[in-house]
Amino acid sequence: MKITSSAAALALVASAVAAPSPTTQDKPTKRQAGCASAVSLNAQTNVFKQYTLHANNFYRKEIEELAIPNLSDPSLEAAARKVADTGSFVWLDTIANVDRLEPALAEVPCNEILGVVVYDLPGRDCAAKASNGELKVGELNRYKTEFIDRIASILKAHPNTAVALVIEPDSLPNLVTNSDVQACRNSAAGYRDGVAYALKTLNLPNVVQYIDAGHGGWLGWDANLKPGAEELAKAYKAAGSPKQFRGIATNVAGWNAWDLSPGEFSSASDAKYNSCQNERTYVNTFGQRLKAAGMPNHAIVDTGRNGVQGLREEWGNWCNVDGAGFGRPPSADTGLELADAFVWVKPGGESDGTSDSSAVRYDSFCGKPDAFQPSPEAGAWHQEYFEMLLRNSNPSLL
């Protein structure tokens, strides 16, 4: 998707989130799962200090059944298994993939929290091609009844399991920066209504919610900070200011550094228009705007693939960045009060989009010089890319 700063006409910032993964459903591992009694999360606190992010079996299965048997270098196996044991988020990115939730919940022990991404708005990812969704503009009722209501029903049936939700990556940030894109104008009402409905309906005692807020290279532009905070705050208030709402998720499926200083693009000609040159600064700066707008402002930050910097020709190049590596592992030790945790939201090894220019879902960002080529369709397993992430991991997994 394309994101532009109104203050810097030369700046073109983009991001996108991969489409559904073909991962098949698996039976939960036989282990002690859930707590003996109902979980009640206090969204006024950082729950990641109490719970460890769960390493879900869907991503584990991709690594154990797709990645490890096909490693070009057997010496990478130990590192691959470390990734399989690392907590990451389960993506509910189609109506059919809601079926992933029940077995995922059934495998979570009491001291862990299941990360779940809710990602199926009508007209999803309105400014990109690689990650368009199944629901068309105007199918909001299907989103509510077949997707969100089903998720809520399953979560209610598992009150003894802690869950952290990331709500609809890329949706509201697109409305802030891509109002000139007709598809985004068409999707706007459904995005706002759908996000508010998701927040209200999934406001459950065992759940803590974070809404997607793009990243520092998106809403971090000086001209985007205030309207961005106001857009997110409107959704929060339209949902009735849900008790289980904690704040924002940043850098989802992204590449931005946590605390690199000066930032990766600090020497660019338009850098003076963006004071948020890393995610740490963005969380602090945008957090102040969120507070002023009347919304909770704590954050989780996706560090799954940001281990290497200086790879992108432009800040907006989002697709399968060549040379990338796994980043900091999930941890509540961020050193910043507003940052609850580093988390792995995007499963490293699942493609961002195809580099085949003849494909229906081809996005030109996946054919950029700094994008890994060849690459398969969004969500498909990308073996060569996974191995590169292992080799370039920082801190090293080798």
Swiss-Prot record:
Enzyme class at the top of the EC tree: hydrolase
Keywords: Carbohydrate metabolism, Cellulose degradation, Glycoprotein, Glycosidase, Hydrolase, Polysaccharide degradation, Secreted, Signal
EC number: 3.2.1.91
Glycosylation (residues): 70
Reaction equation(s) it catalyzes: Hydrolysis of (1->4)-beta-D-glucosidic linkages in cellulose and cellotetraose, releasing cellobiose from the non-reducing ends of the chains
One CC-aspect GO term: extracellular region
GO molecular function terms listed in the Swiss-Prot or TrEMBL record: cellulose 1,4-beta-cellobiosidase activity
pH-activity dependence text: Optimum pH is 6.
Keyword Thylakoid: no
Compartments, as annotated in UniProt: Secreted
Changes after translation: Both N- and O-glycosylated.
Keyword Lipoprotein among UniProt keywords: no
One GO-annotated biological process of the protein: cellulose catabolic process
Pfam families (UniProt xref): Glyco_hydro_6
Principal subcellular localization: secreted
Database matches in SUPFAM superfamilies: Glycosyl hydrolases family 6, cellulases (SSF51989)
Signal peptide per UniProt: 1-18
Thermal response of activity: Optimum temperature is 35 degrees Celsius.
Role description: Exoglucanase that plays an important function in biomass degradation by catalyzing the hydrolysis of the non-reducing end beta-1,4-glucosidic linkages in cellulose and cellotetraose to release cellobiose. Hydrolyzes crystalline and amorphous cellulose but is inactive on hydroxyethyl cellulose, mannan, galactomannan, xyloglucan, arabinoxylan, arabinan, xylan, and pectin.
Name assigned to this protein: 1,4-beta-D-glucan cellobiohydrolase CEL6C
